Every structure is written in C-alpha cells, then in structure tokens.
C-alpha cells in the first residue's frame, strides 16, 4: 500500500517524503512544467547458504555477457513480476561487476516513478529470494569493482501540451536554454543535494575515480565520468531529449531525491544560471584544478555539511524532514568514524 500521510485535521503531514515531492511537483506545475524521470536501478545478486547467510556474487559475468551470465532467467522473471504489478520496464541486462545487474524503469511522472521504485526494490528482493539469492541495493558491496548507481534520466514537459521543453534541434547538444539553466542548477546544488542522493556511508566508496562513477561536478555528452550526461538523440526524436544525473544510488529515498533534483533544476531556471562549457575528456586523467572543477563530497560527513549550507534544498524538503534526516545521517556518520575497521588493524597494529 502506497499513500500520502495527512494529519487529523486533513493537512499534508510535513514529515511525509511523498507529500514533499507532491508539493515540489505542484510548484513545477504552477510554472507550466511536468517533471518526468526514468531511473536505472542497479543491484547485486549474491548466493546464500541454507541458513540465508550471504556468500559471494551469483556469477562471474560482466557487461552484457551471455555465456557466463547465470541470471538471464531471473532478470526475465523480475521484469515480468514488475510488469504484472503495473511497473513498465524499459530494459534489463547484466552490468559490469560480477553478480551486478540493471533494470531500467520506463519514463514516468516523478511521483509515479518514485512509487514504482520503492515497490520495485521490494519486489526484486522477493524474486531473488525465491531463487535462493539475495538482492542488495547497497552502493558498494565489493571493493575493487564498480558499485551500484541509480542514474536518473529527466526532462521537463509542457504541462498542457506534453511538448519536451528540453529540446532544441538547432543547439549543438540539442538542448534548449531552459534545459541549460536546469543543468546549471543541478551543478550548482550538486554538493548540497548529494546527501539525499547518496545517503549512506558506503555511498561515497562508490563515488571514487576509476569505476565509472562521477567525482567532478561537470557535464558532457559521451563523457561517463561527468556528473550530468546528455544522451545523443536520433534526428527527429527530439521528444526523447533528456539529461542523465549520475551520482544517485539505489539506497536513496526516491521521493526526497526527486524533490532535490527538481528544486535544483528549477532554481537554475528561476535564476537563469549560465551553463559552463561541456567537458568531453575522461576527467579521471586531467588536472581538475587546471580545469576549475570542483568535486562531489568525498564522505557522508562532508555531504551533510554541504546540505546544511544549501538553503534551496533545505527549503525544498522542509524543516521537519531536514532536521530528522540530518540527525539520523549524522549519527550514522559518527558511528562509522568511531569504528575501528579490520583494514586499520591489519595495516597499523603490527607496525606502530
């Protein structure tokens, strides 16, 4: 059951993330926009023993492998399950890391997409369990391989006509001025909203160089090291124009994540923020200081500090959720900081 929460006097409950997203979507609608999104949901499948203990990745396959992909039938079962629940699936495939998979949900209104996403995470875990496996949306369960992200494709449509307002066939990137302001807003608030898009201590072990995850706050077309990517659109299909935000991970609350993205983009439109030049080279092999690039937060602690300083994002989620989210995440960060890991024991105990 998915619903919005109201107080006894009939007012939307301020602590309900679904109400927060609805409020932000109402603001967009008042400006003439409809916010559309499509998440790419990545996850790992692990083997389990008879007691349910998690063991190792289900297979040794990689991106779009066939012969070593042991979960083709499971992904098909997952897709059929979602579709039977009214959740449209765009694509399914094996991802880069062993045991890693991706299911892309079809473009939808942001509220419907968030509802589908929270449902899908539960459903996919259930299907995995029926096959004797454990599905995890932990961003980085295995060191040394790619982590699981949740890239979010997004665009604004005209509220009344459904026309894609991001499209401009005459622009070199196919982007309208509105889309450029929207991207500029995402870049301006990237640090401030990062804690909502990547909410775990573990999230920041995914956002490191070398594993196809964004680190630098930049945008480009074919550049998969950039934070925002503009997919190339076939001539004549301009209604499909969209941008892809690459830092979110599947552990996020989609209602809060979509709220933050939309708030950032609308702020860019409202202030007509200029969009810096695109970067198309691999940013992991350039001097970021020479390019004037800043980075995403490198830890949950620094992400929380950035959120505290971002008035636009704080206003979007509201003081009730902001206070509780910051308190809960800060407690997790402090617990992690105080924990002495096995890595530290093995590295330092004998030599100091």
PLM features: what roles do these ranges have?
Residues 1-352:
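Glycine-rich, acidic/polar active-site loops that bind/position phosphate-bearing ligands
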């Amino acid at each position: 059951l998915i619903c919005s929460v109201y107080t006894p006097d009939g007012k939307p409950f301020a602590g309900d993330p679904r109400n927060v997203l609805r409020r932000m979507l109402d603001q967009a609608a008042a400006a003439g926009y409809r916010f559309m999104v499509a998440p790419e949901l990545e996850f790992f499948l692990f083997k389990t023993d008879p007691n349910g203990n998690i063991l190792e990745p289900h297979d040794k396959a990689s991106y779009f492998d066939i012969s070593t992909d042991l979960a083709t039938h499971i992904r098909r079962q997952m897709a059929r399950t979602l579709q039977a629940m009214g959740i449209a699936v765009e694509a399914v495939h094996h991802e880069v890391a062993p045991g890693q998979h991706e299911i892309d949900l079809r473009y939808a209104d942001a509220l419907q997409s968030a509802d589908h996403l929270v449902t899908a995470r539960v459903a996919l875990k259930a299907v995995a369990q029926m096959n004797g496996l454990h599905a995890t949306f932990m961003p980085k369960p295995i060191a040394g391989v790619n982590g699981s992200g949740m890239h979010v494709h997004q665009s604004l449509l005209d509220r009344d006509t459904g026309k894609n307002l991001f499209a401009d066939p005459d622009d070199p990137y196919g982007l309208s001025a509105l889309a450029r302001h929207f991207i500029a807003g995402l870049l301006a608030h990237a640090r401030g909203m990062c804690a909502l898009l990547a909410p775990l201590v573990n999230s920041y072990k995914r956002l490191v160089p070398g594993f196809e995850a964004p680190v630098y706050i930049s945008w480009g077309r074919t550049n998969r090291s950039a934070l925002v990517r503009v997919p190339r659109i076939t001539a004549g299909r301009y209604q499909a124009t969209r941008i892809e935000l690459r830092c979110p991970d599947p552990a996020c609350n989609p209602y809060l994540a979509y709220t933050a993205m939309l708030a950032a983009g609308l702020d860019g439109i409202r202030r007509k923020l200029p969009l810096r030049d695109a970067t198309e080279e691999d940013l992991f092999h350039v001097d970021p200081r020479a390019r004037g690039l800043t980075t995403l937060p490198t830890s949950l602690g620094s992400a929380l500090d950035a959120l505290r300083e971002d008035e636009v994002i704080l206003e979007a989620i509201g003081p009730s959720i902001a206070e509780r989210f910051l308190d809960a995440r800060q407690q997790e960060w402090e617990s992690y900081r105080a924990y002495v890991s096995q890595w530290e024991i093995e590295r330092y105990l004998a030599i100091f």
